[in-house]
Amino acid sequence: MKIVIAPDSFKESLSAEKCCQAIKAGFSTLFPDANYICLPIADGGEGTVDAMVAATGGNIVTLEVCGPMGEKVNAFYGLTGDGKTAVIEMAAASGLMLVAPEKRNPLLASSFGTGELIRHALDNDIRHIILGIGGSATVDGGMGMAQALGVRFLDADGQALAANGGNLARVASIEMDECDPRLANCHIEVACDVDNPLVGARGAAAVFGPQKGATPEMVEELEQGLQNYARVLQQQTEINVCQMAGGGAAGGMGIAAAVFLNADIKPGIEIVLNAVNLAQAVQGAALVITGEGRIDSQTAGGKAPLGVASVAKQFNVPVIGIAGVLGDGVEVVHQYGIDAVFSILPRLAPLAEVLASGETNLFNSARNIACAIKIGQGIKN
């Protein structure tokens, strides 16, 4: 009997890999001879590197890069087991969590470090990059990332500009002649789960600026800057950058990746599941087990468990979802391929205790689910 275990992380409690181990251990008490395939997954955000490295037997590359406020930070990216794909989280180099709350300022923050990670991957002869762009501290339109790869942003006097949100309004022209030529032979996929455009009421400044420390005045300045940036990009590339879905993601990194990296912008879970080859693993399985910290009505909006379920249903394999919490509207997930859902919480407890006991609770829940399946196998109509 083949059982595929493919959970996302339980945030602040368990990594996706540890979730796999706990579920496998629980099921193994009842089904010790089953063939378990563990594929820790992620949706393109935090934890994607760890999940992809664990799922493929890859490794982590560490290096020092320029942080969002210009300081040096220790960053990382992942290499898949075959050595052919780099998995980069923008947050590792340009993340909001790298900046103390009192120092957050998207007018000054730059995505330069993310470009350094991409450049390092190219130096290692990588020709396929998965770039997760969640959790950034920046609203620089991806200027910093592009600058690290050779793009120059000039003001009206032809002087080079520092790449940050405050200089978006000063961009008069863009020189792309010295953009790293290796990008032409590198397939880059951007894991993006929002469709916000670059500018406007749903744009990078209005929606994401306040999350990164922008005051209302900063939001207005950033919006005006992005409007100017968009005009220059459109004039020079003839790409309708204002209407591109996902262009405003990560403070405009979406649009920069599309324009300067020729990247494909896709739902993160779609990229990850293709990369770990979930479809091949699911074929012939008796059961698929997925999960994450919370399963509720929002899960149907494209979260990792629904992505797993959609693949499993292509092969008519039943799916069980396990979560820390089952929230309002959880029953909707049954319409999208998750056949049964379970919470791991044995009782009400303080949050700190719940997070600390996640591994034990997940093991116990997996064992109980396995017990129920074992009982069901013996019940006859």
From Swiss-Prot:
EC number: 2.7.1.31
Pfam families xrefs: Gly_kinase
First-level EC class: transferase
Keyword field: ATP-binding, Kinase, Nucleotide-binding, Transferase
Regulation of protein activity: Inhibited by EDTA, p-hydroxy-mercuribenzoate and iodoacetate but not by NaF.
Pathway the protein contributes to: Organic acid metabolism; glycolate degradation; 3-phospho-D-glycerate from glycolate: step 4/4
Protein name according to UniProt: Glycerate 3-kinase
UniProt organism field: Escherichia coli (strain K12)
